[in-house]
Amino acid sequence: MDIDPYKEFGASVELLSFLPSDFFPSVRDLLDTATALYRDALESPEHCTPHHTALRHVCLCWGDLMNLATWVGTNLEDQASRDLVVSYVNTNMGLKFRQLLWFHISCLTFGRDLVLEYLVSFGVWIRTPPAYRPSNAPILSTLPETTVVRQRGRTIRRRTPSPRRRRSQSPRRRRSQSRESQC
C-alpha cells in the first residue's frame, strides 16, 4: 500500500523531500515545541483540526517506536545488531517523524497555505542551478513579506505611452485625483 500522509493536507512526500534532512529539528525539539504551543489542544478530548489529530497520532506513534527501541535495546544481546537497529530507526523512521512533526506544527503555526507555498518555493529554489538562483533559500517565517502572490486569470497590463507622444494634462488625470479623494 502506498499511503501518503500529507495527501489530505494538499502536500506530498515528494514535496517535503526537497527539504534536506538536516533542515528538520530533532524529534525531541519538535515534540517540545508541539507540547509548548499546543498541549491543551492535543490533550483535549474535543476535535480541534485535522492537523491536531495528525500531530496526536505522530506523537503516539513516536512513543510506541521508542518503547519498541527500548525493548530491542534491552533484549538484543549482540551490540552490533543493536547498533544496526538504532541506526535504521534514526536514519529512516526518525526522518519521517521529523518531517511529519515539522509539517503539522508549521501548518498550525503559519497556516497550511503558507507552508505549501513555502514548500513549492523551496522546491523551485533548490532545483534552480546555483548560478541562477538567489544565494539565500526562502525562509518560512519571512515568506509573507517577500512573496508576490499572483492571482489566476488574465492580468491587465497598462500600456506605457510611446516616447513620441507626450502625455497631455487632460481632464482624465483630474478625474483620477478626484476618485482618490472619495476613498
UniProtKB/Swiss-Prot annotation:
Annotated region described as RNA binding, given as residue ranges: 177-183
Keywords, ordered alphabetically: Capsid protein, Cytoplasmic inwards viral transport, DNA-binding, Host cytoplasm, Host-virus interaction, Microtubular inwards viral transport, Phosphoprotein, Repeat, RNA-binding, T=4 icosahedral capsid protein, Viral penetration into host nucleus, Virion, Virus entry into host cell
Reported function: Self assembles to form an icosahedral capsid. Most capsids appear to be large particles with an icosahedral symmetry of T=4 and consist of 240 copies of capsid protein, though a fraction forms smaller T=3 particles consisting of 180 capsid proteins. Entering capsids are transported along microtubules to the nucleus. Phosphorylation of the capsid is thought to induce exposure of nuclear localization signal in the C-terminal portion of the capsid protein that allows binding to the nuclear pore complex via the importin (karyopherin-) alpha and beta.
Sequence repeat ranges, renumbered to this chain: 162-169, 170-177
Region (Disordered): 150-183
GO biological process: microtubule-dependent intracellular transport of viral material towards nucleus; symbiont entry into host cell; viral penetration into host nucleus
Region annotation (2 X 8 AA repeats of S-P-R-R-R-[PR]-S-Q) ranges: 162-177
GO terms for MF: DNA binding; RNA binding; structural molecule activity
A Pfam family matched in the record: Hepatitis_core
GO CC annotation, single: host cell
Record's subunit section: Homodimerizes, then multimerizes. Interacts with cytosol exposed regions of viral L glycoprotein present in the reticulum-to-Golgi compartment. Interacts with human FLNB. Phosphorylated form interacts with host importin alpha; this interaction depends on the exposure of the NLS, which itself depends upon genome maturation and/or phosphorylation of the capsid protein. Interacts with host NUP153.
Motif interval(s): Bipartite nuclear localization signal: 158-175
Record field: compositional bias (Basic residues): 151-176
Record InterPro entries: Hepatitis_core, Viral_capsid_core_dom_sf_HBV
Descriptive protein name: Capsid protein
Domain of life: Viruses
Gene3D superfamilies: Viral capsid, core domain supefamily, Hepatitis B virus (1.10.4090.10)
